[in-house]
Amino acid sequence: MLRIYAPASSANISVGFDTLGVAVSPIDGSLLGDVVQIEEIEQGFELESTGYFVRKLPKEPQKNIVYQAYVLFSERLKLRNLKIKPLRLTLEKNMPIGSGLGSSACSIVATLVALNQFYQQPFSKMELLEMMGELEGRISGSIHYDNVAPCYLGGVQLMVQSLGNICQQLPFFDNWYWVLAYPGIEVSTAEARAILPKSYTRQDVISHGRHLGSFVHACHTRQEALAAYMMRDVIAEPYREALLPNFAEVKQAVKDLGVLASGISGSGPTMFAIAPDLAIATKSATYLENNYLQNNEGFVHICKVDNVGARALV
């Protein structure tokens, strides 16, 4: 029996729409992510689901992304003339769906990593990552890697998708604390994409390029202040903030508390705030708990960058 954990991720990081993503883990040691267990059985295939958010999953197993990941992986095995083994997959669904924390990516990554290890790793990291992107595309409508890449590989990942590479890891600031606040409401990726304009002004395009280029440069040259200052979003946040509760007010409030940058995690509704120390992170977390959460399903976690990514649990 093998259990694989895949951590939560925050895509875009304000400045890198569809091109940046970061894996995160709570500093208290709790698991913010999905777990998939795999074990051999006598015959056939079985899929079971447990966990706090299991009630949010599709009722039909064929619509479960874990099942679809199993089917895709099996198809790729057949192309290599490898025998399909009878097995059971159990998804522990700990991530809220439509949260902006890479919920579907967690399930996809944990499943494919578990299957690859179960079959003695017939596929390379890039081959597995390509499958992950394809499965993400089935949910959001287009292939993208900004959640699955950091969830799988850890760290901050920049999507390059050229010269045989899907992504490259960026050097980052390990002293930063990531405060993640999920308000307890759902925003679908498809809905969040539909609200974006079909075209952008020349000035917005120039600003976006300047911000992203400067951010990447600042990461490589270890300029914290410049990196934080350039975490600005002219592509998605001005349009998506209408989907989030009291976003502008909350964003200003955490800035006043001393956070370096804040924004929408992925397509929302989770919000992230980056703090330079634990004291400011704690103050920001308390404020967000009292002013951003909308119901009992909401939560706030103080996190650090998860540099490991998907891994086996002992």
Curated annotation (Swiss-Prot):
Cytoplasm listed as a keyword: yes
GO molecular function: ATP binding; homoserine kinase activity
Reaction(s) catalysed (UniProt annotation): L-homoserine + ATP = O-phospho-L-homoserine + ADP + H(+)
Chain residues that bind ATP: 96-106
Keyword annotations of the record: Amino-acid biosynthesis, ATP-binding, Cytoplasm, Kinase, Nucleotide-binding, Threonine biosynthesis, Transferase
Cellular location(s): Cytoplasm
PROSITE patterns the record matches: GHMP_KINASES_ATP (PS00627)
SUPFAM superfamilies attached to this UniProt entry: GHMP Kinase, C-terminal domain (SSF55060), Ribosomal protein S5 domain 2-like (SSF54211)
GO CC terms: cytoplasm
Pathway entry: Amino-acid biosynthesis; L-threonine biosynthesis; L-threonine from L-aspartate: step 4/5
GO biological process, one term: threonine biosynthetic process
Keyword Nucleotide-binding recorded: yes
Disulphide bonds in the chain: none
Pfam families recorded: GHMP_kinases_C, GHMP_kinases_N
Annotated EC: 2.7.1.39
Family of this protein: Belongs to the GHMP kinase family. Homoserine kinase subfamily.
Function summary: Catalyzes the ATP-dependent phosphorylation of L-homoserine to L-homoserine phosphate.
Name of the protein described by the UniProt record: Homoserine kinase
Organism (species): Histophilus somni (strain 2336)
